[in-house]
A protein has these predicted regions:
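Pyridoxal 5′-phosphate
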Residues: 1-437
Length: 437
């Protein structure tokens, strides 16, 4: 589907099943934001009443976001996005502890993957933990990876591609116990701390117990819970030291420089309220919708697999391998039909490599390239699922019949498909050469 070319062109009607990439801004959120884009435009750092009025609304929004994780307002720092929050947490731990080792996983979002890659090039040590074939993580691997020079353990709460949930509260307690052991041996010890990228979780699972857990840092992003893009959150547990990552004025109590994005912060506060209001009912409804979608496809199509531990996932996420078909071909066909889905993280779009998440789970390159992620929100209805289920099975059957990768052309998908792919690429190259002549 293409974006409107001008203001008069109608917005294309779509069935949006890519809510792990971004979400629609809730009408209630937009309504809350409008006054701060028009009449209440004062700088919240100003000393006069007009600025103080605006500052008061930031204070209210901070309290609403804090309630989402059961925290106090002082534990909430507003940022520009989830990526900044992730980067800030890791940078802060490195600075406050003076240590040079980081523990993370092989399936993190690119915000963590690329930052730790950069830190590794700068001489820091990074341990990237493997995951099991179902996408889960072994606690013993985490414990064995922590060293006395570990500054921070950063493990996502829910994987953005598969929806698999990690036991972050247990991991946080493990990290705290290791920190206490190191401090007992050396009273001057600081760290390790625990950070979780929880960007995919608000509104999907209950986070109100976070502040009572041993989690030191937690990242969130507005556009993943029906707030606008361009605003994020870093929760910092009280009495945990934090070093500014964006250095400027004294905004955010000196923790994050730059004039606040007032309208988006107010919108995020309203989105946090809505997430708590809808959590229990919508969680059940969305899970039922997702499960019906998966079960129906499994009944109608052979050679189809659900990635990730089935009973340990976000209620809205489904990552499906459609063997013998390229995900790109599926997504193109879905796009023509007005259905939005993805082949992985929107933040790595354009990469020709298979998903690093699915590769870490042990999927062959061929199967990883056949995977499509569908992710639902409370704006999806049963009619959306009905339409998707009407379109997808015959579409997959047709694509398989056309593809040299299909079951009629190979006896063993996991073994022969790479040879079939090479044959297809050579045929395509010869065709293009003939056209160019």
């Amino acid at each position: 589907m293409h974006a409107p070319r001008n203001e008069k062109e109608a917005r294309p009607e779509v069935v949006y099943l890519d809510n792990n990439a971004t979400t629609r801004v809730a009408p209630e959120v937009f309504e809350a934001m409008v006054p701060f884009l028009t009449e209440y435009y004062g700088n919240p750092s100003s000393a006069y009443g007009f600025g103080k009025l605006v500052e008061g609304h930031i204070i209210q929004a901070r309290e609403k976001v804090a309630a989402l994780v059961g925290a106090t307002a002082k534990e909430i720092i507003f940022t520009s996005c989830g990526t900044e929050s992730d980067n800030m947490a890791i940078w802060s731990a490195l600075q406050t502890t003076g240590k040079r080792h980081i523990v993370t996983t092989q399936v993190e979002h690119s915000a963590i993957m690329n930052q730790t890659d950069q830190l590794e090039r700068m001489g820091f040590g990074v341990t990237r933990l493997p995951v099991q074939p179902d996408g889960t993580l072994l606690l013993s691997d985490v414990e064995n990876a922590i060293r006395d020079d570990t500054a921070i353990v950063s493990i996502m709460w829910a994987n953005n591609e598969t929806g698999v949930l990690f036991p972050v509260e247990e991991i946080a307690s493990l990290v705290k116990r290791k920190r206490e052991e190191f401090t007992k041996a050396n009273p001057r010890n600081k760290g390790p701390f625990f950070h979780t990228d929880a960007v995919q979780t608000p509104g999907k699972i209950d986070l109100r117990h976070v502040a009572k857990s041993d989690i030191d840092f937690l990242s969130m992003s507005g556009h993943k819970l029906h707030a606008p893009k361009g605003v994020g959150v870093l929760y910092v547990k009280r009495r945990t030291s934090v070093v500014p990552y964006v250095i400027g004025g004294g905004q955010e109590r000196g923790k994050r420089g730059g004039t606040e994005n007032v309208a988006s912060i107010v919108g995020l506060g309203r989105a946090a309220e809505l997430a708590l209001e809808k959590l229990s009912d919508e969680q059940v409804r969305i899970r039922a919708m997702r499960d019906r979608f998966e079960e129906t496809l499994l009944q109608r199509l052979p050679h189809l697999y659900i990635n990730g531990k089935r009973d340990q996932r976000l209620p809205n996420t489904s990552n499906i391998a459609f063997d013998f078909v390229e995900a790109e071909a599926i997504l193109m066909k879905l796009d023509v039909a007005g259905i939005c889905a993805s082949s992985g993280s929107a933040c790595t779009t354009g990469s020709l490599d298979p998903s690093h998440v699915l590769s870490a789970m042990g999927l062959t390159p061929a199967r990883a390239r056949s995977c499509v992620r569908f992710s639902f929100s409370h704006y999806n209805r049963d009619t959306d699922i009905d339409l998707a289920l009407e379109i997808i099975p015959p579409m997959i059957e047709k694509l398989r019949a056309m593809s040299p990768l299909g079951p009629d052309h190979t006896d063993n998908f996991n073994y022969d498909v790479e040879a079939a792919r090479e044959k297809e690429e050579k045929l395509m190259a010869a065709t293009m050469a003939a056209i160019n002549e």
